[in-house]
């Protein structure tokens, strides 16, 4: 089956373009009933509060939660990671509704505002083992969240060093006791738990499609028909968008 991409706001076009490079059709999802057409789903980066309001307006949250509960693969990038988290802190007054399912606590905008966005080379040994290529990945962080805590069943795929003071300021938002401060700590920026994948950065804004390939293999592991659908999808795209304009730059 095709891969759904939640197309309420954010970098959904870039995800669809990355899937197309791998010969897989991406389907824009805006309504609950459209989820029945796909076997997996990507929730892209964007403005998480805006995305949540639009999802609530279209009554998508019950269908998204059911999609997760059915064990279908879901990948959240940046704002999508916030959606999948069981708990989010650092939110605006009133917070936002979450899909949940990923046993972690995410700090929204952990790395700061738009002007504090950055790129860095992340160590990704698990990704390299599965997909080949270098053991680093160019992480593009734009008003990015970070994962502060994970449950025992969550596999950490990448982390990033931060000054201990910044981390402890964020942990205080969890009302958790602070440990003795060191010079540097790490926050988690990529995780996997069963059918769920989460990245705090934007793989869709790079020319490296290994995270998309990794997610497609997760999809193939879930259903017997998924692996064959990926191989026969080819480069054909019958969606209404013949050419996809990029809302955000693709970093080479």
Ranges and model annotations:
Residues 1-57, 61-72, 209-213, 217-252:
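N-terminal beta1-alpha1 cap of cysteine-dependent amidohydrolase-like domains
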Residues 8, 79, 201:
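Cofactor-binding loop segments of dinucleotide-utilizing enzymes, especially the Rossmann-like FAD-
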Residues 31-34, 104, 162:
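Short, acidic/turn-prone active-site loops that include or flank metal/cofactor-
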Residues 36, 97, 135:
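Structured loop/turn residues at beta-strand edges in well-structured enzyme cores
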Residues 36-38, 85, 126, 199:
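Short secondary-structure boundary/hinge segments and terminal tails
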Residues 43, 76, 199:
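Redox-cofactor binding/interface segments in oxidoreductases and associated redox assembly factors
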Residues 47-129:
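Cysteine-nucleophile active-site neighborhood
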Residues 108-114, 120-252:
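Amide-donor transfer/coupling interface in amidating biosynthetic enzymes
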């Amino acid at each position: 089956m095709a891969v759904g991409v939640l197309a309420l706001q954010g970098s959904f076009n870039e995800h669809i373009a990355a899937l197309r490079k791998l010969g897989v059709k991406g389907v824009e999802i805006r309504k609950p009933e459209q989820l029945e057409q796909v076997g997996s789903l990507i929730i892209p980066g964007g403005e998480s509060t805006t995305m949540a309001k639009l999802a609530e307006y279209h009554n998508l949250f019950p269908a998204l939660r059911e999609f997760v509960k059915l064990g279908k693969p879901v990948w959240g990038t940046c704002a999508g990671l916030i959606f999948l988290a069981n708990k989010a802190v650092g939110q605006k007054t009133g917070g936002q509704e979450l899909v949940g399912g990923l046993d972690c606590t995410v700090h929204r905008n952990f790395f700061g505002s738009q002007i504090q966005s950055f790129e860095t080379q992340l160590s990704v040994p698990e990704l390299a083992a599965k997909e080949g290529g270098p053991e680093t990945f160019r992480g593009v962080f734009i008003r990015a969240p970070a994962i502060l805590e994970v449950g025992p069943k969550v596999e950490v795929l990448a982390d990033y060093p931060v000054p201990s003071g910044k981390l402890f300021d964020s942990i205080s938002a969890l009302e958790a006791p602070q440990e003795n401060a060191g010079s540097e700590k790490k926050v988690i920026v990529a995780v996997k738990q069963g059918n769920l994948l989460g990245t705090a950065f934007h793989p869709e804004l790079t020319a490296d499609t290994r995270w998309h390939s990794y997610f497609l293999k997760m999809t193939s592991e879930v259903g017997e028909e998924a692996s064959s659908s990926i191989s026969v999808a080819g480069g054909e795209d019958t969606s209404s968008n013949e050419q996809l304009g990029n809302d955000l730059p693709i970093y080479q």
